[in-house]
């Protein structure tokens, strides 16, 4: 059986189209979806019906699905979520709301597990360790190669003092996750961990591409093939600049553009900057209101988008 593993589409229908065309060309028979299907790009009402109708599909929800249920406010910090919620078709929202947080099943002699973040399997410290807000600082010489990232990812996992203990009590099988938008996989004995990367919003400091992973399970053998379909984001950026989303959430959408043109994280760094800016001008309103959010972004832009490390 050949599985196409897809995560973090984030409303990017053109990227999903590239992935599905490639998966079909390479004989994908089943589709495993690891969450975060909307918010960031505006085509989620095309993305969701496409995913729902894939053959032999299994899907879980991500962390951003819950943002579609935020009470609408006047702030700019969550404006992109409010806009997406206001435009989400009811049947698409109902499908998202029906998705479980995790799935576990046996198929073709193998146990499968899907959750949105690695922390569901190995603890929250693993989620924190692999957050994308450290990658842009770790790889100032980006774009990096997949081989380098795979090696670094494995070493980082193995370097954790309790990794062997956690692995020892984890049932054998294949563990699929997304969340940090970084394509990787690692096998430790009969434990295989796969992050297909982000289909629609890659942040792994490699070449910008529509990412997914092919997994073949046959006669007890597991074969992983990471797939990246490069494309130019600039035409999509120009198209989105004419969209309702750009008018409703210009700061957030400009952050999306920065991420796409560098294949690295900017959103978290900007939120750190906005917090410092708001404190400096004596604005204690949270979430950030439009005037402060916009002014903070304009200053951050003038300063060359400085990267503010996490605590």
Tell where the protein language model's regions lie, with residue ranges.
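Active-site environment of divalent metal-dependent phosphoester hydrolases
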Residues: 10-15, 39-42, 64-69, 120-122, ...
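Beta-strand-turn-beta hairpins that frame and shape the catalytic cleft
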Residues: 1-4, 104-113, 188-193, 222-223
